[in-house]
Amino acid sequence: MLCFADLPSEIHHRIIFHLDSNRDVAALSSQCKALHSLCDMSNRKKYSRVRITPSISDLDRAFKMLMDILRRRSLGRYVRHIEYRQTISRYCQYDVKPYEPKLSEEDMRLLRNATQRAGFTRALQERVLNMLVRELVVGDRLYGTFSDTRAPATYVTQALTALLVSLSPNLESMAMMPTFYTNFDEDTADSFMHSECPLDLLLRETNENPVDKPYLQNLRRVYMINLGDDHSDDGRLYVAMDFIGCLAILRNLPSLEWIGTDALAEDDNVLPALGPKSSNVSCIAIHHSAVATSYLTPVIRSCRALKEFEYSIGGRGSVNGTQPTFNPKTFFLCVLEHKTTLERLDLDVESHIFSTVYRGPGDFEFDEEDGRAEAQAYWIESPPNSFWDQRGCLKDFEALKSLSIGVHFLLYFATGVNNENDDKIVPLVEYLPPNLEYLCIRGYEKGKRKRNDAQMDALKALLDSDSTSLKEIHGVDECIPNAEDIDFPDNYPDLLWKLPDEWSDEEE
């Protein structure tokens, strides 16, 4: 009988090429010496991940990887994750400086060809080349990083990242800071300054014209690193970042599924607008953040088919001690547009909902702040009347399998909006989504409200009856607390959320 190891090497190559995980390839390589050689595990591990920061050691490592790939293009297929960490604190035109020709003529030819393949031509090509070799200029360095002038660091890190992205056809995930400069201080309609930043230009061009590009075709996940303007995040407060602007320059990438961030506060930028159903993104995760419903609305509505949405507050203090408005009705209408596709919804926001003391559906009056009237009067682009006139309730979410939510918000979802149940209390067990398998309820305390106790007892009885798709319920027998802002962050450092800074060459 023919075994796998006896198959022709061409078939082995094809199988290995389609394995996403290095761990799977490593397991395959252990089967025999021939497969071990084909799997090339040492190079797979070495080139699978790269981090680009203003640190000279990181830049040297990334530049060496770039040259290795240019000399042996097959190495670029191993790159699966790229992290870019550099802020753009202000716009400054790139200052071309002469460089010492330490690279060979052949290496310079390879660099020149690579910049051209990445779409940089004519004068811009020469500037990008200058950025790539500028790291050899001693005068730019200070204490192991680039000098306080942010422009050189920004351009060098962006040029390196852009070239590595363009040479990595199997790139699946990125973690990066915003690639563009936004002037938060000037009240102008043109919030985006002209950009010469190579990574920003590469992303924008590919987003606008993704067809026939040999790069960014397999990128599925992007995490936006939120360290603030000029790395201003001190770890205590929510941080303003133009998340909408970041989504706008990524949304058309053909394989992009997931985008997320943490510690997000609203920025002052109002451009560009996100039109409805304009994004390929289907999964959004915004955690430890504080933004209003007016901010989340265009993000959610931009998805052509939303499958997963996660939003949580807490872990930081607010900038001025106030909370952004979270309007449950407006939010419900946003996700109701995706009732046939939404599979997972995770919300930990009840502490930001005004009038959260729930006595009955009629106690919720959410037509004012971030509601229909205010949106139509003050939002830059208010949803149409058809959005506000939607009718629906929790059981209309036919694709929903996993739901994590505060107890009061859950009961509000069950009642729904613009339907015959307005001002009524409905039995939760009769309004669950038909395919729900997992339910996590936050903030429920047994004995605090008899009406809620009866609803939770009915849920437990339903689970025991085996007549439901529901397989797990959490937060009924034990209280799962709602997330909250940290009112005095200096007094509670252990409660503050921090961005993990772990890095290794091991695949996640």
Language-model segments: residues:
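Leucine-rich repeat
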Residues: L2, H12, M41-K46, D60-R71, S74-H81, Y155-L163, L167-S173, D212-R221, ...
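N-terminal adaptor/linker regions at the entrance to substrate-recognition repeat cores
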Residues: L2-D267, V281-S282, L436
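Leucine-rich solenoid repeat modules
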Residues: I15, I69, S89, L336-E508
